[in-house]
């Protein structure tokens, strides 16, 4: 027998003051200082989870804070460089830059940091049923991530299948029912139990 340790932190919520703190003299951004203080603890864990609350929808859009965030991709670089190996990307701010921003964010993770398991969003809606898996010392973990909503009562229909939601959604109108659990959640958990030794569910409540 042996131990497998898990560390989870968040929310990594990039208000504009935090964004400004990472700006360098040459105009580039470096956010490594955000995680320097926790690195010794972080690197002692096997599973290192962070909730990246704000979307990285592309630097060319410009950066924005509350209520509709857009964060620098250098935040993602700092997360990966710090040693996080799981990123929870489903939050109420994931759709702040609409579908284009979500897709940019998903593509950034896939191509820039493929070593990081990103859960909660899908670049391809046909992959919405896929179960994110992480194997540590021959033990397989399913790590599921859902958000309660997306900063609106009505979800843009083009986001269906791209963002994991806790609430039920009318697929014709996009109306979200915050009192009813999305049946996809229980279906995912059921399939995850078949694929993994341990299932971890990370809901974003607010």
Predicted regions and their residues:
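Acidic, metal/ion-coordinating pockets
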Residues: 1-206
